[in-house]
Amino acid sequence: KVIGGGPMMGRALVNTEVPVAKGSSGLLLLNRKESTRRPMRDCIRCGKCVGVCPMGLNPAFIMRDTVAKNWDSCEKMNVADCIECGSCSFTCPADRPLLDHIRIGKQTVMGIMRSRKQ
């Protein structure tokens, strides 16, 4: 697996034909064992994701509402303020893909907000 942008904020590359440019912050190469996700478990409500969020968001609740497609609640919880640092996912002892869901919620909510302005 090849990740462009580093271990925390990087994104998996679909193929290796993506060019590396001056602004590229790095490439991370993972073997099969390192790139396999551990199975996700139920949230244990430890609050570690909230404690590490530099924006003061509640990643666990945002993920819950993204899964439920409750976009109004995601907007009220300021999902658009997420800087996508990945600290929440990295810290989660239940191995929940918090950032993946937050990115979906953020993209959807920002689309809704743009359509309101038009």
Predicted regions: what they are:
Residues K1-A94, L99-Q118:
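Redox cofactor-anchoring modules in respiratory/redox and cofactor-processing assemblies
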